[in-house]
């Protein structure tokens, strides 16, 4: 029998990476919030890799942090190792990647949720969503408890009708042996949502004591740790190494000899898998001429012998897994602690959502994370934060917060999902961002902290810290224009030592720093009046802003054109089938997606430049008609 168990402003269903950010955002903005997890020990569960960040993902984490989210802070608290990737490439693609202690990450996030004012967390499976007059009014647990709410955020990850597959064995399950959420999937279907079936997988976890690391290449962390969060200036820990090894011909032979036992190729798995994170059997089949594949051995935590075998995700039978693992140098005597598995799950077609991540069908119902067809902890957390912010803004009668593609990777992520949709698990890539030189991990605070402060998530402490950095950067950039460097033996010897051309005439230091081989820190001895308190992060900004000034200005001009199209708003009630000249496909797609601007309409698959021209002419006619009516009136 059902009973009223409580009344809240917001209910968050699922407390993984998306749900944790959503719940914290709502509670911190003053809304009475309740969060549900099938098991409270699964909060912020890292069901796959023990790492945060990497290309494009690090940018997301920094953006979450700049807006006042939790992921970066929690990563720094749980750190085992950190490295900066792509250091030999340009700043647009440089990114941090942190190895974290999985259990510590979960415990820290759970404690953060427990301590948060306005937030209750409960262990329960949500099976139904209550709707009246097309508005969310509550959620129902498996035990019949009704929690009334004005907004609900669905962040169920891979739990919806989860099914684990290992060889010819399959069973209903969420990730890591947790219960699946089967009834909620049926509820969403009943409410009219189109569901898709996706698949992901995870590699085996092996016993550290059974590994011969002498046959592998050590992968240490950076000598100087760069924190993920802008709130942390320094982190001092003894870092744990990762290890690199490779598959070989024998590994591939075993996989191919047993490929008929792979559910991926037998038809047992019907869900669409992750393109950019293929299983080992997928790699061997698709790249038959490749002699070896990289395998990284990563620690799962400080207080465990479990090691994560990155690059060997598989759904082959357990006996085959052990056989091919033992062909890898260093793993000849390996003991498997947890076998690799694939997991299929339901997710929604994200084109059913607005850019706020609110459902177009039901008011007050939001979706975030893997349930929207994405993959990755970082992508989930970013969506969770924005869904939480927008649910709160709506209930507080404040304007929605929609980041555009020129502001943040978060904007690219959400725009791609709601405009284009996805037919496979969506992963954030730097190549997806048109303005990636503007959307670097080093400047996320400059892009988003003031917005986060205006929203109410950025604390006064964080805001003052940011302002100090901003003022210091602006003052130092101006000062460098007035620092004259004259040719001298000392100066020219320095330039020659850096592989740079000697000076013939004097030049300001700002101009000298445009040379790629000269960095700001190395010129301190030439700059007698340089302040002693320049932050490392400011020094980094100076180098990037000066060296890439021309490219940055070019992208800013491109953004002006982009903004012009984004600012051409399309009326909500427009009937595309009444517009003569639009192709039938465009009418269908525009009606389904209902873009809010010409810019968004132009990014919809199936809408051609000719269709956009027709739409622009139609909107000009609408505007003229409105002006004529106003003059007559």
UniProtKB/Swiss-Prot annotation:
InterPro entries: FAD/NAD-bd_sf, GIDA_C_N, MnmG, MnmG-rel, MnmG-rel_CS, MnmG_C, MnmG_C_subdom, MnmG_C_subdom_sf
Alphabetical list of SUPFAM superfamilies matching this protein: FAD/NAD(P)-binding domain
One Gene Ontology term from the biological process aspect of the record: tRNA wobble uridine modification
Subcellular localization(s) per the UniProt record: Cytoplasm
Binding site for FAD: 14-19
Gene3D superfamilies to which the protein is assigned, alphabetical: FAD/NAD(P)-binding domain, GidA associated domain, C-terminal subdomain, tRNA uridine 5-carboxymethylaminomethyl modification enzyme MnmG/GidA
GO molecular function annotation: flavin adenine dinucleotide binding
Chief location: cytoplasm
Key words of the record: Cytoplasm, FAD, Flavoprotein, NAD, tRNA processing
Keyword Acyltransferase in record: no
SMART domains: GIDA_assoc_3
PANTHER family associated with the record: GLUCOSE INHIBITED DIVISION PROTEIN A (PTHR11806), PROTEIN MTO1 HOMOLOG, MITOCHONDRIAL (PTHR11806:SF0)
Subunit structure: Homodimer. Heterotetramer of two MnmE and two MnmG subunits.
Function: NAD-binding protein involved in the addition of a carboxymethylaminomethyl (cmnm) group at the wobble position (U34) of certain tRNAs, forming tRNA-cmnm(5)s(2)U34.
NCBIfam families: mnmG_gidA
Name the UniProt record assigns to this protein: tRNA uridine 5-carboxymethylaminomethyl modification enzyme MnmG
Organism: Thermoanaerobacter pseudethanolicus (strain ATCC 33223 / 39E) (Clostridium thermohydrosulfuricum)
């Amino acid at each position: 029998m059902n009973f009223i168990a409580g009344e809240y402003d917001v209910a968050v269903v699922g407390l993984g990476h998306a749900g944790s950010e959503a719940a914290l955002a709502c509670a911190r903005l003053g809304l009475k919030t309740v969060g549900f997890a099938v098991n409270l020990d699964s909060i912020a569960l890292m069901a796959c890799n023990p790492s945060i960040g990497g290309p494009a993902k690090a940018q997301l984490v920094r953006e979450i942090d700049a807006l006042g989210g939790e992921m970066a802070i929690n990563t720094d608290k749980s750190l085992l190792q950190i490295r900066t990737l792509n250091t030999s490439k340009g700043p647009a693609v440089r990114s941090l990647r942190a190895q974290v202690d999985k259990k510590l990450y979960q415990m820290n996030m759970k404690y953060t949720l427990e301590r948060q004012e306005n937030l209750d967390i409960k262990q329960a499976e949500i099976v139904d969503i209550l709707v009246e007059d097309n508005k969310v009014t509550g959620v129902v647990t498996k035990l019949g408890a009704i929690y009334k709410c004005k907004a609900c955020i669905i962040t169920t990850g891979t739990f919806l009708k989860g099914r684990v597959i290992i060889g010819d064995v399959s069973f209903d399950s969420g990730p890591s042996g947790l219960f699946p959420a089967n009834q909620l999937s049926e509820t969403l279907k009943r409410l009219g949502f189109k569901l898709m079936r996706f698949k992901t997988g995870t590699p085996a976890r092996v016993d550290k004591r059974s590994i011969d690391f002498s046959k592998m290449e050590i992968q240490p962390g950076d000598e100087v740790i760069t924190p993920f969060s802008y709130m942390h200036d320094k982190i001092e820990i003894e870092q744990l190494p990762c290890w690199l090894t490779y598959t070989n011909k024998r590994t591939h032979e075993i996989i191919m000899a047993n490929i008929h036992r792979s559910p991926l190729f037998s038809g047992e798995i019907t869900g669409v898998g992750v393109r950019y994170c293929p299983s080992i059997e997928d790699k061997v089949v698709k790249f038959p001429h490749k002699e070896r594949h990289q395998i990284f051995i990563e620690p799962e935590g400080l207080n465990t012998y479990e090691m994560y075998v990155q690059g060997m995700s598989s759904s082959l039978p357990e006996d085959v897994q052990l056989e091919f693992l033992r062909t890898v140098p260093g793993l000849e005597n390996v003991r498997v602690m947890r076998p690799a598995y694939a997991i299929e799950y339901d997710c929604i077609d994200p084109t059913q959502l607005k850019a706020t991540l609110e459902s177009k069908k039901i008011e007050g119902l939001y979706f975030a994370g893997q349930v929207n067809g994405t993959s990755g902890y970082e992508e989930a957390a970013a969506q969770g934060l924005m869904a939480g912010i927008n649910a709160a803004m709506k209930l507080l009668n404040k304007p929605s917060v929609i980041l555009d593609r020129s502001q943040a990777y978060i904007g690219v992520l959400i725009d791609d999902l709601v405009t284009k949709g996805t037919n496979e698990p969506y992963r954030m890539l730097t190549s997806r961002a048109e303005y990636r030189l503007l959307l670097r991990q080093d400047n996320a605070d400059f892009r988003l902290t003031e917005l986060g402060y205006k929203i109410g998530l950025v604390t006064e402490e964080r805001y003052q810290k940011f302002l100090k950095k901003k003022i210091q950067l602006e003052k130092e950039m101006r000062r460098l224009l007035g620092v004259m460097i004259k040719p001298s033996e000392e100066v020219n010897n320095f330039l020659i030592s850096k592989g740079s051309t000697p000076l013939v005439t004097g030049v300001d230091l700002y101009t000298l720093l445009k040379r790629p081989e000269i960095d700001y820190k190395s010129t301190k001895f030439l700059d007698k009046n340089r302040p002693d308190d320049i932050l490392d992060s400011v020094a980094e900004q100076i180098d990037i802003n000066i060296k890439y000034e021309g490219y940055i200005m070019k992208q800013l001009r491109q953004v002006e054109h982009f903004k012009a199209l984004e600012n051409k708003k399309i009326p909500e009630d427009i009937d595309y089938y009444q517009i003569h000249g639009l192709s039938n496909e465009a009418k269908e797609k525009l009606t389904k997606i209902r873009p809010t601007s010409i810019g968004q309409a132009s990014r919809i698959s199936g809408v051609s430049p000719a269709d956009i021209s027709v739409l622009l002419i139609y909107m000009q006619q609408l505007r003229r008609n409105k002006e004529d009516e106003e003059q007559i009136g």
